[in-house]
Amino acid sequence: MIAGAGIVGVSLARELRKHCASVLLVERGEPGREASHAAAGMLAWCDPMLPHPLKRLAKASAGMNPEFAQEIEDESGMRVDLRTQGTIACFPEPPTGDAAGYVSAGDWRPLAADELARLEPRLEYSGEAAYWTPEGSVDPRALIAASVKAAKHRGVDIASGSAVTEVELEGGRAVAARTAKTRYAAGKVVNCCGAWAGQVGPLRFPTRPVKGQMLCVVAERHGLVNHVVRAPEVYVVPRSDGRIVIGSTLEDAGFDKRVDPETIQRLHQAAANLIPELGESRMLETWAGLRPGTPDALPLLGATRIENYFVAAGHYRDGILLAPVTALVMSQAVRGSIPDFDLSAFSSARF
């Protein structure tokens, strides 16, 4: 039984269904309507700001994404808009030290002005820039919708509309999960509740919501932006249908998902400073999402100190990127196998 039907929970359920007779997902609201729905969908495994222990997992997950996306499309009959054109990073200064070494390992290379103009003709930026060729993006709303359909196709059961609040113990091991109205008996319980993971007893994991405000626009010119474009104060993520996502803030605002018009305007202007035509684009939507953060910005992955109780939460800004590898290693852990990657840095025992 898995509590939480965001991209992590749904991906794990789908993976477990290959090996388990039955898998139940229990979701507080509608599947995939929280952080997964609000994400930009960048597959930013080359990001020099990625915490060091995550780099190996992130690189592996990025390599899994094409096959992962194709399987989901095949099983669901839906498209997820996986784009692999790469990322253009606009730096106030070129990366140095460990950051430079890491992004170089990810096919990072500096861009001369003429090549930058060729790759993004409408980008008006004269500072240092780099091209992270293996990166890309996916439409997270399409991905989670297709993933839910694919999970159902594999036989995963989904109960929505009620939050898991307690894990029932018997003899020191997890035997069931409870919502306000229902008890679900289970041989194994996995907490995939994201920012809400700490609200599920008996272990109060130190997850917290980190608010991010974003907007989506459409420009008159189709193909205005060809790549994900990242700068210190803003990022721009194009979709294949002409929509362009602009984000984002990092706010400690609890579970408040209200949108501030001034903040949205500031993000829109920051994007227009890079690509002036974005300033004339038509706004389609604004929203705020709650990223699941932890004190050290690393996810919680693996078994807990309670037998048969597992956690996969706290992926912060990288849930979409890390979904494939999380599904793999957590499926292995839940089934009692040794995970392909060392999860000790992500153990909940560190808190």
Regions found by a protein language model. Give the residues of each.
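Glycine-rich FAD pyrophosphate-binding loop
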Residues: 17-39
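Active-site substrate-recognition segment that forms the wall
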Residues: 11-19, 41-44, 78-83, 183-308
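Short beta-strand to alpha-helix junction loop
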Residues: 56-59, 93-95, 130-149, 258-263, ...
